[in-house]
């Protein structure tokens, strides 16, 4: 099931979560993710590192695409997020890894909301 939200961020739900525990603005979340460019070139993966990523969601600690998409997921849910450049790293990109204005694709699993 696909859903397009703010900023043309697309959420493709891969497997359901608990359906009731959704992060709210400012919550600490624990996420496993793999990030790729549209050409499928991987640029980062918490899965490969064997260490989930933690951040406070909705408060600008991460790219805007995550801030708007992660609160739509429930604990345990896996999803593919397609995030246009304006809601990712924008015109600056991330030198050496992500070109300017690149659309990013993340496979994410919301492990925990603290």
Curated annotation (Swiss-Prot):
<feature type="domain" description="PPIase FKBP-type">
    <location>
        <begin position="26"/>
        <end position="114"/>
    </location>
</feature>
<dbReference type="GO" id="GO:1903644">
    <property type="term" value="P:regulation of chaperone-mediated protein folding"/>
</dbReference>
<dbReference type="GO" id="GO:1901711">
    <property type="term" value="P:negative regulation of homoserine biosynthetic process"/>
</dbReference>
<dbReference type="GO" id="GO:0006366">
    <property type="term" value="P:transcription by RNA polymerase II"/>
</dbReference>
<dbReference type="GO" id="GO:0006325">
    <property type="term" value="P:chromatin organization"/>
</dbReference>
<dbReference type="GO" id="GO:0005527">
    <property type="term" value="F:macrolide binding"/>
</dbReference>
<keyword id="KW-0697">Rotamase</keyword>
<dbReference type="GO" id="GO:0003755">
    <property type="term" value="F:peptidyl-prolyl cis-trans isomerase activity"/>
</dbReference>
<dbReference type="InterPro" id="IPR050689">
    <property type="entry name" value="FKBP-type_PPIase"/>
</dbReference>
<comment type="similarity">
    <text>Belongs to the FKBP-type PPIase family. FKBP1 subfamily.</text>
</comment>
<dbReference type="InterPro" id="IPR001179">
    <property type="entry name" value="PPIase_FKBP_dom"/>
</dbReference>
<comment type="function">
    <text>PPIases accelerate the folding of proteins. It catalyzes the cis-trans isomerization of proline imidic peptide bonds in oligopeptides.</text>
</comment>
<dbReference type="Pfam" id="PF00254">
    <property type="entry name" value="FKBP_C"/>
</dbReference>
<dbReference type="GO" id="GO:0044183">
    <property type="term" value="F:protein folding chaperone"/>
</dbReference>
<dbReference type="InterPro" id="IPR046357">
    <property type="entry name" value="PPIase_dom_sf"/>
</dbReference>
<dbReference type="GO" id="GO:0001228">
    <property type="term" value="F:DNA-binding transcription activator activity, RNA polymerase II-specific"/>
</dbReference>
<dbReference type="GO" id="GO:0005737">
    <property type="term" value="C:cytoplasm"/>
</dbReference>
<protein>
    <recommendedName>
        <fullName>FK506-binding protein 1</fullName>
        <ecNumber>5.2.1.8</ecNumber>
    </recommendedName>
</protein>
<keyword id="KW-0413">Isomerase</keyword>
<dbReference type="GO" id="GO:0070651">
    <property type="term" value="P:nonfunctional rRNA decay"/>
</dbReference>
<keyword id="KW-0963">Cytoplasm</keyword>
């Amino acid at each position: 099931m696909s859903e397009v939200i703010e900023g043309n961020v697309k959420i493709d739900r891969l497997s359901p979560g608990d359906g009731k525990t959704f992060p709210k603005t400012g919550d600490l979340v624990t996420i496993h993710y793999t990030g790729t460019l549209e050409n499928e070139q991987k640029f980062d993966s918490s899965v490969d590192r064997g260490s989930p990523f933690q951040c406070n969601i909705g408060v600008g600690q991460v790219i805007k695409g995550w801030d708007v998409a992660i609160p739509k997921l429930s604990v345990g849910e896996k999803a593919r997020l397609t995030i246009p450049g304006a809601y990712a790293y924008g015109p600056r990109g991330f030198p050496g890894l992500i070109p300017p204005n690149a659309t990013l694709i993340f496979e994410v699993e919301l492990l925990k909301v603290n």
